[in-house]
From Swiss-Prot:
It comes from Methanothermobacter thermautotrophicus (strain ATCC 29096 / DSM 1053 / JCM 10044 / NBRC 100330 / Delta H). It is found in: Cytoplasm. Homooctamer. Dimer of tetramers. Pfam families: FMN_dh. The lineage of its organism: Archaea, Methanobacteriati, Methanobacteriota, Methanomada group, Methanobacteria. This is Isopentenyl-diphosphate delta-isomerase.
Length: 349
């Protein structure tokens, strides 16, 4: 049953090593330090408008859970934190709630606790018929369509037929009255796919790159035969490289997620052109201790982001996107071989 699988996923993410063994690529990114920032750190503004909503910070809580009674507490605490902080919150796949109405409460609790926060619904690309209900269920401000071919390939009994996915995404865009964004689930999005997605009419793309939670790893723990999961544990496009590939290829907003573990990572992602960053695993453990702990985590990210901006001489997020950045190592090699010019980032002003 879907509900039982959701619980397994939640337990595994909270208690096992499910992160990529390779890096996000942000270790190859350096923001050029300014010894004379010429700004007042106290006046740095990290607020933004995203898909028509005013947010206090570009740090959002990415989709984590839903669909099992045990997930209700997690979503409640995350929603309380999002409401108090004025940030966006993404929910886990709502398929379980649509197919089993008795589980709707594990999702609707988010809107009950966060009446004014930006909530992002979540369905799979093949479930066109679930789109409207998913939005209605939580009065969503936007709908995320998740892509997870890697996870499905490793998951016992997974759906490995992606035929017609782009057509389905286009239909979902047409079927709902809120912005639709597309997100990967930990393996990243390349330039070619980003261009196709923009042509489908989506309003934003969340790269959800490699370097954070590996869903191949999660499914490895669930499988009787772990060979395939072990083999593909680190499969995917590192988050930093995926962020540049997508930012350089489309004109819609990009969210960088996948292994964002600090405000410095957030600053680096935004300096590469991301509008927002998403975090999940860092707040999962905190949510078990209550929304105040979640708030502490987010505020820690925000303070580190402001500090990085100060040291870059960036008073706003737009200023940070213009700050010079050095791209080296594996990320630089990846991008150069893929035809993206990295030197232009180094001489921005």
């Amino acid at each position: 049953m879907i509900s039982d699988r959701k619980l397994e996923h939640l337990i595994l993410c909270a208690s096992c090593d499910v992160e990529y063994r390779k890096k996000t690529g942000f270790e190859d990114i350096e923001i050029v330090h300014r010894a004379i920032p010429e700004i007042n750190k106290e006046k740095i503004d990290i607020s933004l408008d995203f898909l028509g909503r005013e947010l206090s910070s570009p740090v959002m809580i990415s989709a984590i859970t839903g669909g099992h009674p045990a997930s209700m507490k997690i979503n409640r605490e995350l929603a309380r934190a999002a409401e108090k902080l004025g940030i966006a919150l993404g929910l886990g796949s709502q398929r379980a709630g649509v197919e089993h109405p008795e589980l709707e409460g594990t999702y609707t609790i988010a809107r009950e606790e966060a009446p004014s926060a930006m909530l992002i619904g979540n369905i799979g690309s093949s479930h066109i018929e679930y789109a409207e209900r998913a939005v209605e269920m939580i009065d969503a401000d936007a709908l995320a369509v998740h892509l997870n071919p890697l996870q499905e390939s490793i998951q016992p009994g997974g759906d490995v037929d992606s035929s017609g996915a782009l057509e389905s995404i286009s239909a979902i865009v047409e079927s709902v009255d809120v912005p639709v964004m597309v997100k990967e689930t930990g393996a990243g999005i390349c330039s070619e796919d980003a261009i196709e997605l923009e042509s489908c009419g989506v309003s934003a793309i969340d790269v959800a790159g490699a370097g954070g939670t590996s869903w191949a790893a999660v499914e490895t723990y669930r499988a009787d035969d772990r060979y395939l999961g072990e083999l593909f544990w680190d499969w995917g496009i590192p988050t930093a490289a995926s962020t540049v590939e997508v930012v350089e290829s489309v004109s819609i907003p990009v969210i960088a997620s996948g292994g964002i573990r600090s405000g410095i990572d957030a600053a680096k992602a935004i300096s590469l052109g991301a509008e927002m960053v998403g975090i999940a695993l860092p707040v999962l453990e905190a949510a078990g201790h209550g929304y105040r702990e979640v708030i502490k985590v987010i505020e820690g990210f925000n303070e580190a982001l402001r500090t990085a901006m100060y040291l870059a001489g960036a008073e706003t997020l737009d200023d940070l996107k213009k700050s010079p950045v050095i791209i080296t190592g594996h990320t630089g090699e990846w991008l150069n071989q893929r035809g993206f010019e990295t030197k232009k980032y180094a001489r921005r002003s």
